[in-house]
Curated annotation (Swiss-Prot):
<dbReference type="GO" id="GO:0050482">
    <property type="term" value="P:arachidonate secretion"/>
</dbReference>
<feature type="disulfide bond">
    <location>
        <begin position="49"/>
        <end position="122"/>
    </location>
</feature>
<dbReference type="GO" id="GO:0006644">
    <property type="term" value="P:phospholipid metabolic process"/>
</dbReference>
<protein>
    <recommendedName>
        <fullName>Basic phospholipase A2 homolog</fullName>
    </recommendedName>
</protein>
<dbReference type="InterPro" id="IPR036444">
    <property type="entry name" value="PLipase_A2_dom_sf"/>
</dbReference>
<feature type="disulfide bond">
    <location>
        <begin position="28"/>
        <end position="44"/>
    </location>
</feature>
<dbReference type="GO" id="GO:0005576">
    <property type="term" value="C:extracellular region"/>
</dbReference>
<dbReference type="Pfam" id="PF00068">
    <property type="entry name" value="Phospholip_A2_1"/>
</dbReference>
<feature type="disulfide bond">
    <location>
        <begin position="43"/>
        <end position="95"/>
    </location>
</feature>
<feature type="disulfide bond">
    <location>
        <begin position="75"/>
        <end position="86"/>
    </location>
</feature>
<feature type="disulfide bond">
    <location>
        <begin position="50"/>
        <end position="88"/>
    </location>
</feature>
<feature type="disulfide bond">
    <location>
        <begin position="57"/>
        <end position="81"/>
    </location>
</feature>
<keyword id="KW-0964">Secreted</keyword>
<dbReference type="InterPro" id="IPR001211">
    <property type="entry name" value="PLipase_A2"/>
</dbReference>
<dbReference type="GO" id="GO:0042130">
    <property type="term" value="P:negative regulation of T cell proliferation"/>
</dbReference>
<dbReference type="InterPro" id="IPR016090">
    <property type="entry name" value="PLipase_A2_dom"/>
</dbReference>
<dbReference type="InterPro" id="IPR033112">
    <property type="entry name" value="PLipase_A2_Asp_AS"/>
</dbReference>
Amino acid sequence: NLIQFKKMIKKMTGKEPVVSYAFYGCYCGSGGRGKPKDATDRCCFVHNCCYEKVTGCDPKWDDYTYSWKNGTIVCGGDDPCKKEVCECDKAAAICFRDNLKTYKKRYMTYPNILCSSKSEKC
């Protein structure tokens, strides 16, 4: 769920998730349209696509099982849908970490109105 996702992001990046990512670029936070502004925004685009593929549970609200082993997220549990959501969140948190060097403060609260180009397909 979103609370678990926030914890993953915080641990992976050291950044405060809501402040740093909830309104970043054209795809972080709710919805999304246009072309991703940079690699971090593309992480959100891919994460949104990942959530769209999930069926049988609610990615934003259903709890899943995960643990940390040697700084790595390990998704577990018996529910395949919830495990898939965990894998989506894990991939996004890793993507954010891997793109910290190109994170741009100017995209932190990017106005959605500027995301007007044609949306990419998943």
